[in-house]
């Protein structure tokens, strides 16, 4: 079990590290590097715990609290978000500290009562601008609905310029250290991008508005302590700037080709498209979906300007392994992307129309409709067309 970690004098990380989790939100999100469930204790004249942990790790949380002060006494329990990975230990904490006063949004209170109807607790509904004094420090709250649940809010400690934004600015990564200056910067940003792309992308417009709101009130931020992953203390501006880019849909001259194949015909088309894109000066990421992690593909789509999806026809439909990516894209609604559908068929088609309909449903602009299709096997002229389309797309998305 890891130990409490001081963020500054009197403020501690008291969360838990989950080294073994490999899927999150059921099977929806791959977590190859594990995750953390971050909770924070603020000790002043009064003591506040900001968020809890996933229920299986409740004893770790309680043990850390006892290392700081035993017996544990909490004046406040701040619930930024009621999802089980953050509020799963709510019953255990309320049993340990039944007099703790819960601070949360109205939507969070409604969710807590739905999840834990058997627990009675004292509470105050907070809104943006509500402030609670702990002594030398205070807590100020900023509602953040749909980032990423309706109940979500940020907690801010103005005296320390410390932002506790729950799921915002987080990453799914398990580490033995807690801060951004202790972990490879590229690794952290890669996991932060994957987190944003797969969880927060549908809420990009709201994120832009929230970042603008924070800027308008001139919120000083020295440290960002999210509820998953590392704490940003060296360069919190880096992740804020990244969120601003991602939320606006800023991309680069990059294309993602995601496909699968039965007897290599669609694969040959994918490679010809890639050759054209590369010849046009474009960065390319190529994924055969049956051997690729869908969440990693979506992470690469985040900063790409073009998305090319290929499938042969099977039973007048697309390959089953291709469908989940398209389903995700429809829900995630990536911004400012152009796309192309391609594939092979035998005696009857069908996949091409489905691919194009799904890409359009994801608000991806088709650069050619219909895209390239071939019967049975691609010939030289078919591959040349794919190559030329690749060059055309590269020119379209060039910097």
From Swiss-Prot:
Which cysteine pairs make disulfide bonds? none
Q: Please give the residue ranges the record annotates as the region Zinc metallo-hydrolase.
A: 32-221
Q: Which residues cross the membrane?
A: none
Q: Which Pfam families match?
A: Flavodoxin_1, ODP
Coiled coil located at which positions?
none
Enzyme class, top EC level, equals: oxidoreductase
Q: What is its EC number?
A: 1.-.-.-
Where on this chain does Fe cation 2 bind?
85, 167, 228
Oligomer status and interactors: Homodimer.
Could you tell me what this protein does? Has nitric oxide reductase activity in combination with Hrb; probably involved in nitrosative stress protection.
Name assigned to this protein: Nitric oxide reductase
Which gene is the coding source of this polypeptide chain? Answer: fprA
């Amino acid at each position: 079990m890891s130990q409490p970690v001081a963020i500054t004098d009197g403020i501690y990380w008291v969360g838990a590290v989950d080294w073994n989790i490999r899927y999150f939100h059921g099977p929806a999100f791959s977590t190859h590097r594990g995750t953390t469930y971050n909770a924070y204790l603020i000790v002043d004249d009064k003591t506040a715990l900001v968020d809890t942990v996933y229920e299986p790790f409740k004893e770790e949380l309680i043990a850390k609290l006892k290392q700081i002060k035993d017996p544990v006494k909490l004046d406040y329990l701040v619930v930024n978000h009621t999802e089980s990975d953050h509020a799963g230990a709510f019953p255990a904490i309320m049993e340990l500290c039944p007099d703790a006063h819960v601070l949360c949004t109205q939507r969070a209170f409604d969710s807590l009562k739905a999840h834990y109807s058997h627990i009675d607790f004292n509470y105050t509904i907070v809104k943006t601008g509500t402030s609670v004094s702990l002594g030398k420090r205070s807590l100020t709250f900023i509602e953040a609905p749909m980032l990423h649940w309706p109940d979500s809010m940020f907690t801010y400690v103005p005296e320390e310029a410390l932002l506790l934004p729950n799921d915002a600015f987080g990453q799914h990564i398990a580490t033995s250290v807690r801060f951004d200056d202790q972990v490879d910067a590229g690794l952290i940003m890669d996991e932060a991008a994957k987190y944003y792309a797969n969880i927060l992308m549908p809420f990009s417009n709201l994120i832009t508005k929230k970042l603008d709101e924070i800027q308008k009130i001139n919120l000083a931020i020295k440290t960002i302590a999210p509820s998953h992953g590392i704490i940003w203390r060296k360069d919190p501006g880096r992740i804020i700037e990244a969120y601003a880019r991602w939320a606006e849909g800023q991309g680069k001259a990059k294309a993602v080709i995601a496909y699968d194949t039965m007897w290599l015909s669609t694969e040959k088309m994918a490679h010809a498209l890639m050759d054209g894109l590369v010849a046009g000066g474009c960065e390319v990421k190529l994924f055969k979906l049956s051997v690729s992690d869908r969440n990693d593909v979506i992470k690469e789509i985040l900063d790409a300007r073009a998305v090319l999806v290929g499938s042969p026809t099977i039973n007048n439909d697309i390959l089953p392994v291709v469908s989940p990516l398209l389903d995700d894209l429809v829900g995630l609604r990536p911004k400012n992307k152009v796309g192309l559908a391609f594939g092979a068929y035998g005696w009857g088609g069908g996949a091409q129309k489905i691919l194009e309909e799904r890409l359009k449903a994801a608000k991806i602009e088709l650069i050619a409709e219909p895209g390239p299709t071939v019967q049975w096997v691609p010939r030289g002229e078919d591959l040349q067309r794919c190559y030329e389309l690749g060059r055309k797309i590269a020119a379209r998305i060039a910097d």
